[in-house]
């Protein structure tokens, strides 16, 4: 019985833990992120304003509009998509923050009935 109560108390304490998020600190700025292409690690940079996201990667520049849903979630849509798949908006959600970085997840903003739902995660570091 004591073990059960101890386990119950531990679970109760752990369930009250909430990840601290200061999402508004990461709404705008210059950020750096790592990604892999064919197993090769690369680093990209992006600049985000309240309404625009500009990506710099592999000597390319790409722009997207940004629409904030709340302090921790936004929808991003490419301004000049090059193909049909780039026309799809992406929903980003900041999961946790530290002093200079945040962890996020992203997925297609609109569900495609013919595709399996795919959620990816990443981390971005604020450099400016």
Segments predicted by a language model, with ranges:
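Beta-sheet ligand-binding and adhesion/scaffold domains
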Residues: 80-128
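Short hydrophobic/aromatic-rich beta-strand segments that constitute the beta-sheet cores
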Residues: 33, 53-56, 74-78, 102-106
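Bacterial signal peptide processing site
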Residues: 17-19
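N-terminal glycine/threonine-rich, aromatic-flanked beta-hairpin/loop signature
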Residues: 42-69
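C-terminal motif of bacterial Sec signal peptides marking the signal peptidase cleavage site
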Residues: 12-15
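Surface-exposed, beta-sheet-biased, low-hydrophobicity segments with strongly acidic/polar composition
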Residues: 41, 46-48, 71-73, 83, ...
């Amino acid at each position: 019985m004591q073990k059960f109560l101890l386990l119950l108390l531990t679970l109760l304490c752990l369930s009250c833990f909430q990840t601290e998020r200061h999402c508004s600190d990461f709404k705008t700025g210059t950020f750096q992120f790592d990604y892999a292409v064919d197993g090769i690690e690369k680093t990209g940079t992006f600049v985000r304003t309240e309404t625009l996201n500009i990506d710099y990667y592999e000597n390319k520049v790409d722009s997207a509009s940004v629409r904030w849903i709340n302090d921790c979630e936004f929808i991003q849509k490419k301004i000049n998509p090059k193909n049909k798949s780039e026309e799809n908006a992406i929903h980003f959600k900041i999961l946790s923050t530290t002093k200079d970085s945040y962890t996020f997840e992203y997925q297609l903003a609109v569900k495609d009935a013919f595709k399996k739902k795919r959620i990816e995660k990443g981390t971005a570091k604020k450099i400016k």
